[in-house]
Amino acid sequence: MAVVATLRLSAQGTVTFEDVAVKFTQEEWNLLSEAQRCLYRDVTLENLALMSSLGCWCGVEDEAAPSKQSIYIQRETQVRTPVTGVSPKKAHPCEMCGPILGDILHVADHQGTHHKQKLHRCEAWGNKLYDSGNFHQHQNEHIGEKPYRGSVEEALFVKRCKLHVSGESSVFSESGKDFLPRSGLLQQEASHTGEKSNSKTECVSPFQCGGAHYSHGDSMKHFSTKHILSQHQRLLPREECYVCCECGKSFSKYVSFSNHQRVHSGKRPYECGECEKSFSQKSSLIQHQQFHTGGKPYGCEECGKYFSLEGYLRRHQKVHAGKGPYECGECGKSFSSNVNLKSHQRIHTGERPYKCGECEKSFSRKPSLSYHQRFGRPRWVDHKDRKEFKTSLGNIVKSCLF
């Protein structure tokens, strides 16, 4: 790398960080986009980590190398103007990342992005330094974009990535990274709501730092209360946690998984009573029975009638039980149909909606009106100067000659 070659030329004198850093003016900095500023920050942190690993430090002569908490530099300007309130020999404009970030990235804006977080070091990638946001993005490069999955893989993943808490730092055993918990919170994802599997994963509540924080690993969303987190998990699709070892198909419910296994085992517990054929699933048996019943698979054991829907069969079975499905709330009588029930209820209410257009009589049932119009009222018929009067019995009661 060009930076390494530059640092190796330090035999004649001390190499300063300004030799490898790029300086922007205020006008140039304002023209940069947010993505360009983040890229510039990452490159600066990488150069800073490289100088730290090679032992190249800038500062007062014969002074010991700084600790992790401070870095000593000299400014690039001709006049070595110290930061206000700080010694000219030791500049600490930013306590989190060292003074060079305060000089280049403008101390006020840079400190506002820290939120009291520290740099994280990844040993697997050459001791590179990252802040909290970039470190978790870099961490996902080792373990994939979704480090916590809401299925059986999640339980195996949590067991494989053993997280040990010791003081401030935590060790990620899979990639050998040493880092600090994000915002003082060690997130250990629990299993999804409604998930069932043979191997259970204990749900470890996350540590709290100044307040409750609950996170969902799939969407990386954070919630203030555990109740809101549970509601969010119910909206997500359930993971398929039952996997068939024969064909690799996965199922979210154990019932579906058990029915599928009969395909491989050859079990057929459902038999047809007509032709003695057997089926592995009940739905297949019902579909087969339609060939025997003419599209009506639900049959009554009492009288042998078949129905297309199960609800019709239940209603029919109440007839054999001596009780109709429709019961009157006034007298307790039961009827086989809703029409008969409504006609019966008019007896209690006194309603007579059917009226005769000739004699203005009213009836509670339409068949009573039809009977009245046909036989109940007198009707005169002229036939050879005779009029016949028919009664309700249809017989000639009286014959009059005029």
Curated annotation (Swiss-Prot):
UniProt lineage: Eukaryota, Metazoa, Chordata, Craniata, Vertebrata
Chain's gene name: ZNF587B
Record function comment: May be involved in transcriptional regulation.
ZnF C2H2-type span: 92-114, 120-142, 242-264, 270-292, 298-320, 326-348, 354-383
Protein name per Swiss-Prot or TrEMBL: Zinc finger protein 587B
Classification via Gene3D superfamilies: 6.10.140.140, Classic Zinc Finger (3.30.160.60)
Numbered residues of crosslink Glycyl lysine isopeptide (Lys-Gly) (interchain with G-Cter in SUMO2): 177, 200, 253, 366
SMART domains xref list: KRAB, ZnF_C2H2
Disulfide bonds: none
Species for this entry: Homo sapiens
GO biological process: regulation of transcription by RNA polymerase II
